[in-house]
Structure formats: C-alpha cells, structure tokens
Amino acid sequence: GLRLEDYSCPGATAYVEPHGNDAIPHDTVRQQVERAIADRKLDANTRLVTISAGVNDTYQPNNLPSMTTQPQRMARYDAAMTGAINRVKSVAPNAKVILLGIPDETDGHNHTCGSNLLGVTSHWYFPLVAYYQDEVREQQRLAALHTGSEFLDMVAEISVQSGKNGCSNDPGRYGASIFDDSPHKLAGHLTDAGHGYYGRRIAETYR
C-alpha cells in the first residue's frame, strides 16, 4: 500500500495569496507543495498526489466579482495550478496527479439546498453557487488537461440526478446540505459516506 502524507489545509486556495484580511487563514497549494518538498515527503518515490482547490478562492475579499472578471480568475487559476502541478511532477516524476472535483451543490438549477432533515429539503435561490461551481469545475478540468493529470469530475457523479448530493433524500448521500441529518463533519461538505466514495474513486483512478 501507499503511505499517506497529508499537507492539505482547511481553507487552502489555488491562487489567492494569504493576506491579513482573509476570511479564513489559509495557504496555497503551491505553498503546500513546497513544504512537502522541503520535508522530503514529495520525491521520486511518491506514487500518487491528490489536489482539490478552487472553491476557497471565490470568497476571498480581493477576489470578489466586483473586483475581478471570470477570465481573470480563470487565467490566475490556470497559472497557479499548472505551476504547482508541474512543480510536483518535476520532483515526483513517477507520481500520478489527480485533481479532485467538487460535488454538485445545487438542485440542478439555481437553487442550493440549505437544509435536508427528515427527508425534507429546502431549496434556496442562490445562483452564485451554480455560477462559481461551473467556474471551478472548468478551472480544474483545464488545469488537469494542461498538465496531463487526471480529473475526477464529481459534479457529474454526485448530483441530484444521481440521488447522492445534499439535495437528495438518500440517507446514504455523499454531500451534506448546510443543515443536514446525515453523518458528516462539516456543513455543506462531504458526508462520511461521501469521503468513502472519494477514497474508492481515487483508488480506482490510481489503478
């Protein structure tokens, strides 16, 4: 098996550098990569690197829609992530790099589900969720394409259509709404079952 080295950080960003007025203190993927290299945990013996980043860039104070355009954000993401991934590949040439996509956080339209309790979901009109979700999905897809990496498109796999996201009534769903009675650690993120699903999909892609 593979030995796990975890350099992830809650709130990590792809391209927005840390700043004193950050909504949540964070580092960047590139900083995580450099830390792993400095610790000699990322090298020619590394076989697998998984990366998930993009959502946390969207709400940083200096990256809001009033201050940036979508083409600017797309370009900044691509430059930062391709740089970080190519850095990984330069020191770990034997590693497979997998970009982990995010689940669909909507009901398939412009609503997100604020609560999912006792089989009843509430649908909140929140078009920015769908807008940014599509943006991040395309950013990740292009970064994988431009670096010859794998992209796990989880919007396609965990959605209301598949019956597995936070808007779904399946008690074994993989995504949690903000107020959710399925077992999970953080609102609006993966459920315990969702973490297991991601793990299985990573293993399948690695093989």
Model-derived segments and spans:
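Residue-level recognition of beta-strand->loop/alpha-helix junctions
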Residues: 6-8, 101, 153-155
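Residues at the starts of beta-strands that form the adenosine-phosphate
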Residues: 3, 94-96
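A generic secondary-structure signal
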Residues: 35-39, 83-88, 142, 201, ...
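Catalytic His-Asp segment of secreted/periplasmic serine-dependent ester chemistry enzymes
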Residues: 105-207
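Conserved SGNH/GDSL esterase-like catalytic core that processes O-acyl groups on lipids
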Residues: 1-75, 79
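Conserved N-terminal glycine/acidic-rich loop preference
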Residues: 44-62, 68-89, 98-99, 103-151
